[in-house]
Amino acid sequence: MKKIRKGDSVIVIAGKDKGKQSTVIRFQSTERVIVREVNKVKSHIKPNPNRNIAGGIVETEKPLHISNIAIFNPEKNKADRVGFRFNESGNKVRYFKSDGTLIDS
């Protein structure tokens, strides 16, 4: 089970976008994630009339290393750590280590 998953609310803790809060869009690999509206880079796109692609400069989100983000705790309004424990039915669930509230309801 992963500590950070797709759709989690995260905050950037290092880099040029430090302090920005957003959600995880997808995982690039096991160590890199793409976060919505964070780490945006301008790319120059060549026009391709066969695919109906207009050329120009496009802003895209580039992946961040997973060590540069932390899960965001909305109750404490700050970054938090993730722990694992088993609930009553025996399923493994994630929880915030600072206050013990469950992430996966």
UniProtKB/Swiss-Prot annotation:
Part of the 50S ribosomal subunit. This is Large ribosomal subunit protein uL24. Keywords: Ribonucleoprotein, Ribosomal protein, RNA-binding, rRNA-binding. NCBIfam families: rplX_bact (TIGR01079). HAMAP family: Ribosomal_uL24_B. It comes from the Bacteria. One of two assembly initiator proteins, it binds directly to the 5'-end of the 23S rRNA, where it nucleates assembly of the 50S subunit. One of the proteins that surrounds the polypeptide exit tunnel on the outside of the subunit. GO terms for molecular function: rRNA binding; structural constituent of ribosome. GO terms for cellular component: ribonucleoprotein complex; ribosome. Belongs to the universal ribosomal protein uL24 family. The keyword Signal does not apply. Gene3D superfamilies: 2.30.30.30. InterPro entries: Rib_uL2_dom2, Ribosomal_uL24, Ribosomal_uL24_KOW, Translation_prot_SH3-like_sf. The lineage of its organism: Bacteria, Pseudomonadati, Pseudomonadota, Betaproteobacteria, Nitrosomonadales. It comes from Nitrosomonas europaea (strain ATCC 19718 / CIP 103999 / KCTC 2705 / NBRC 14298). The keyword Cell cycle does not apply. One of its GO terms (biological process) is translation.
